[in-house]
A protein has these predicted regions:
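A eukaryote-biased signal for long
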Residues: 109-264
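Cysteine-centric segments in proteins
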Residues: 3-5, 12-13, 22-24, 86, ...
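Long, contiguous regulatory modules within eukaryotic nuclear regulatory proteins
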Residues: 1-67, 79
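Alpha-helical protein-protein interaction elements
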Residues: 11-14, 95, 255
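Compact, glycine/acidic-enriched structural inserts
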Residues: 73-104
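Generic structural hydrophobic/aromatic packing signal, biased to beta-strands
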Residues: 20, 49, 66, 83-86, ...
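Eukaryotic short linear interaction motifs
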Residues: 27-32, 42, 54-63, 71-75, ...
Length: 264
């Protein structure tokens, strides 16, 4: 019994709302927009964390990119890399980053980066158990996982070990991390690494653009694994926070992936 209590001694250091979002591949300006049929048509997979102000979250929104275009498999304890694209105080900065974008290239002419599509909404926590940091979430939308969630590995709930990379250290092989765009931490926060390659204790390290991290699949039952009841709410199109808090426009961002789990 003592061993069981020790496993469940968990400190929640941050909680809030989480959204999963994908962006279709870039196309030429003169090409008609096509619906996404599967993960091969996905350019990038994002995760947005909005810490609740009462949990001490310094950044209102963190827009993150997850490598391999999907979450790590929890059953296989798979690991995927990621990095923080944007740290924003307003929803408008995030919605602008996720909107349709037109740009010119010298060799291929004008290109279009399609608007991102929401693929999941839920609640999350960052929690410490001993020297480990965990990211755990529970979905509120869609009600049932569809093809989108299955291919992006968005389970109804899951937990991951989270390690944040020291920008002053080299990257281990086969992580997908590199030195480009690395975070520039103030001296006080840089000391949190204590000359280690990764840190696992302080979520403030995620509040800097360019911060790089590793997610390792841990489990698919947060209550059993961490002793935390995430208490997701029943949401619908009318109550979804992604439209109220993140302020995504339904007219610009197809919502079928979020509500029905079908690709668009």
């Amino acid at each position: 019994m003592a061993e069981k209590k020790e496993r469940q001694r968990t400190e929640v250091v941050e909680h809030g709302n989480i959204w999963f979002i994908y962006r279709p591949k870039v196309r030429a300006e003169d090409e008609p927009e096509q619906d996404v049929d599967g993960i091969d048509d996905v350019e990038r997979f994002h995760m947005v964390l909005r810490p609740d102000a009462r949990s001490g979250g310094a950044a209102r929104f963190r827009l993150m990119t997850i490598g391999a275009k999907r979450l790590p498999d929890t059953g296989e304890h798979e690991r995927n890399w990621g990095f923080v694209d944007l740290v924003a105080k307003s929803a408008g900065q995030v919605t602008e980053a996720l909107g349709e974008d037109h740009y010119d290239t010298k060799t291929r002419g004008e290109r279009v980066r399609p608007a991102a599509r929401p693929a999941g909404e839920g609640v999350y926590v960052l929690a410490r158990t001993g020297s480990k940091m965990h990211l755990a979430y529970a979905l509120e939308l869609p009600d049932k996982p569809g093809p989108v969630q299955k291919q992006l590995n968005i389970e109804p709930e899951a937990s991951f070990a989270l390690s944040i990379k020291n920008p002053e250290k080299g990257s281990p092989r086969n992580t997908g991390l590199d030195s480009a765009g690395k975070a520039d931490y103030p001296e006080k926060l840089q000391k949190e690494f204590r000359d280690r390659r990764f840190a696992t204790e302080d979520p403030r390290l995620l509040d800097y653009e360019g911060a790089q991290f590793i997610l390792i699949g841990a489990g698919s039952d947060v209550k059993r694994d961490l002793g935390i009841d995430l208490e997701p709410e029943d949401e619908s199109e009318g109550t979804a926070d992604i439209f109220k808090q993140l302020r995504l426009s339904k007219g610009k961002h197809p919502i079928e992936p979020l509500l029905t789990g079908e690709w668009r």
